[in-house]
Amino acid sequence: MGLSDGEWELVLKTWGKVEADIPGHGETVFVRLFTGHPETLEKFDKFKHLKTEGEMKASEDLKKQGVTVLTALGGILKKKGHHEAEIQPLAQSHATKHKIPIKYLEFISDAIIHVLQSKHPAEFGADAQGAMKKALELFRNDIAAKYKELGFQG
């Protein structure tokens, strides 16, 4: 299920928009995730108390988490599918320490797509959306395979 060179080009061009404002994109992605799927808050001890969108937007910890996640994801996307070295420790920590179900990675992927659509409608057309969805699915599938190796049924 690899991506073509053209698809990777679309993914990385779009990701350039994210990198221009990682804190803003990260915050918006996590607010979208937590408001759309409040059950995901339970996996984040430092965010469990956040009940409203306003509280979420005011949280410096949430902003930092957004930067951490999107920076890591950007590094993975830039590997164009050759991300074994990056995926291994991520899968290990998400399976054994954080116990993040794959379903939650689908939720955050959907949040990323939504945020890109809303922040960059002109640059994130159907082709770019399709390529990004494919890249995020590749990432999730590779994490899921590592989860299986680790015996985590997330």
From Swiss-Prot:
Signal peptide boundaries: none
Keywords: Cytoplasm, Heme, Iron, Metal-binding, Muscle protein, Oxidoreductase, Oxygen transport, Phosphoprotein, Transport
Positions of heme b binding: H94
One Pfam family this sequence matches: Globin
E.C. numbers: 1.7.-.-, 1.11.1.-
Single GO cellular component term: sarcoplasm
Modified residues (Phosphoserine): S4
PROSITE patterns: GLOBIN
Keyword flag Kinase: no
Subunit structure, as described in the record: Monomeric.
Biological function: Monomeric heme protein which primary function is to store oxygen and facilitate its diffusion within muscle tissues. Reversibly binds oxygen through a pentacoordinated heme iron and enables its timely and efficient release as needed during periods of heightened demand. Depending on the oxidative conditions of tissues and cells, and in addition to its ability to bind oxygen, it also has a nitrite reductase activity whereby it regulates the production of bioactive nitric oxide.
Catalysed reaction equations from the record: Fe(III)-heme b-[protein] + nitric oxide + H2O = Fe(II)-heme b-[protein] + nitrite + 2 H(+); H2O2 + AH2 = A + 2 H2O
Protein name per its UniProtKB record: Myoglobin
UniProt cross-references to InterPro entries, sorted A to Z: Globin, Globin-like_sf, Myoglobin
PANTHER family, per database record: MYOGLOBIN (PTHR47132:SF1)
Organism: Elephas maximus (Indian elephant)
Keyword Cell membrane: no
GO MF terms, alphabetically ordered: heme binding; metal ion binding; nitrite reductase activity; oxygen binding; oxygen carrier activity; peroxidase activity
